[in-house]
Amino acid sequence: MRLIPLSTAQQVGKWSANYIVEKINAFAPSADRPFVLGLPTGGTPLATYKALIELHRAGKVSFQHVVTFNMDEYVGIPADHPQSYRTFMYENFFNHIDIKDENINLLNGNATDPQAECARYEAKIKSYGKINLFMGGVGNDGHIAFNEPASSLASRTRMKTLTEDTRLANSRFFDNDINKVPKYALTVGVGTLLDAEELMILATGINKAQAVQVATEGAVNHLWTISCVQLHPKAILVCDDPATMELRVKTLRYFQQIEAQERQQYQD
């Protein structure tokens, strides 16, 4: 696992955006061979989306031959609801880049048969072979997407019951009223994430520090979904300074030294 310790959330956004652009451009996607990108919602990736939009406007990257799959969607709220993840993605990213609408893949939280919708989504992912890079965030309790604590590390896309902690955390988007937060969501599984060629998790803020510590220094544990990054051959954890506060000094210095050497080698 690679851990990128940075100072601020803004730096996390810029670093992760530049990494995505590097990967897309190195892949040199085409209509017949698109780059497949997994995407999250929430507050953490907003800085990344902002930086990606700026890089696109500067002519540094095109999304014409990029196919996206989003991590999750609430069940039971209209697609055009202000807090649907479809609305979030279009307002904060898709409307500002040159991605083709047919290349955007989002879970349908209003499907009459949620199980069939999840199977369709998995099949669509597999039709592209694999996701080249899946970016995600992490919750205070270590969840990734809506893979809540005790999710199977082999799980696939499915419907999940949201914990009270998750609904309480998300109530800030629903007038601070937990009763307005949906109780269910469709989400890619942990196994779906682990199938990606690369997995990049963003963690910012002191409230993510315990999750970062468990992911980096703890054992693989289904009660902490974030620990699954230890099972991935190409996982990256990009953190700001507050998110590393629970790490041992020796651990943090190790990763700082590794990244300093990487930068020096790149400059040489």
From Swiss-Prot:
Site keyed Part of the allosteric site: positions: 151, 158, 160-161, 254
An individual GO BP term: N-acetylglucosamine catabolic process
Active site feature: 72 (proton acceptor), 141 (for ring-opening step), 143 (proton acceptor), 148 (for ring-opening step)
Class of enzymatic activity (EC top level): hydrolase
Gene Ontology cellular-component annotations: cytoplasm
PROSITE patterns with a match to the protein in the record: GLC_GALNAC_ISOMERASE (PS01161)
Entry annotated with the keyword Hydrolase: yes
GO MF annotation terms: glucosamine-6-phosphate deaminase activity; identical protein binding
Keywords linked to the UniProt accession: Allosteric enzyme, Carbohydrate metabolism, Hydrolase
Pathway recorded for this protein: Amino-sugar metabolism; N-acetylneuraminate degradation; D-fructose 6-phosphate from N-acetylneuraminate: step 5/5
Keyword Hydrolase (UniProt): yes
Activity regulation remarks: Allosterically activated by N-acetylglucosamine 6-phosphate (GlcNAc6P).
Annotated EC: 3.5.99.6
Reaction catalysed by this enzyme: alpha-D-glucosamine 6-phosphate + H2O = beta-D-fructose 6-phosphate + NH4(+)
InterPro entries cross-referenced by the UniProt entry: Glc/Gal-6P_isomerase (IPR006148), Glucosamine6P_isomerase (IPR004547), Glucosamine6P_isomerase_CS (IPR018321), NagB/RpiA_transferase-like (IPR037171)
Pfam family, one: Glucosamine_iso
Superkingdom of source: Bacteria
Job of this protein: Catalyzes the reversible isomerization-deamination of glucosamine 6-phosphate (GlcN6P) to form fructose 6-phosphate (Fru6P) and ammonium ion.
Protein family (similarity comment): Belongs to the glucosamine/galactosamine-6-phosphate isomerase family. NagB subfamily.
HAMAP family attached to this UniProt entry: GlcN6P_deamin
Subunit structure comment from the entry: Homohexamer.
Protein name in the entry: Glucosamine-6-phosphate deaminase
Organism per entry: Proteus mirabilis (strain HI4320)
